[in-house]
């Protein structure tokens, strides 16, 4: 019996020590249709006057893109802290929730085609900008 307990302990130890893959994601809010918005501050990178971080949308129910269903989208977003603007430069849409499953669609914005959006007050995007530009 004691050996069985010790065996199970060492078998499960790596699982207990490794955090889940979504551990760094912070919930920012949700819309009335149930879409949850998250951000991963651990991906924060300074790029001159810009900050880059990963964002995620997790859908309550699947949507279609190019004839395939997706449940979540992970984006790479740039934040201009001075101008209070943002631009999504990369989007990957996944078949599963929280960025899991297979990539059903991927789109990367070319640098010359980046569209900068103003950050409006009291929005989820403003919460993202605050994490990128205001918090340490």
Predicted regions and their residues:
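Bacterial N-terminal signal peptides that target proteins for export
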Residues: 1-9
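Bacterial N-terminal signal peptides
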Residues: 8-18
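N-terminal secretory-pathway/extracellular module detecting exported/lumenal segments
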Residues: 20-136
């Amino acid at each position: 019996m004691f050996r069985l307990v010790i065996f199970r302990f060492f078998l499960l130890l790596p699982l207990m020590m490794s955090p889940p893959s979504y551990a760094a994601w912070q919930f920012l809010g949700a819309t009335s249709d149930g879409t949850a918005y998250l951000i991963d501050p651990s991906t924060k990178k300074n790029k001159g006057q810009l900050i880059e971080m990963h964002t995620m949308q997790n859908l309550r129910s699947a949507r279609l893109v190019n004839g395939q269903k997706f449940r979540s989208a992970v984006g790479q977003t740039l934040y201009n802290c001075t101008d209070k603007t943002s631009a999504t430069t990369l989007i990957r849409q996944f078949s599963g929730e929280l960025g899991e499953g297979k990539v059903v669609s991927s789109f990367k914005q070319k640098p010359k085609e980046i569209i900068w959006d103003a950050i409006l007050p009291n929005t989820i995007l403003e919460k993202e900008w605050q994490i990128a530009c205001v918090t340490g």
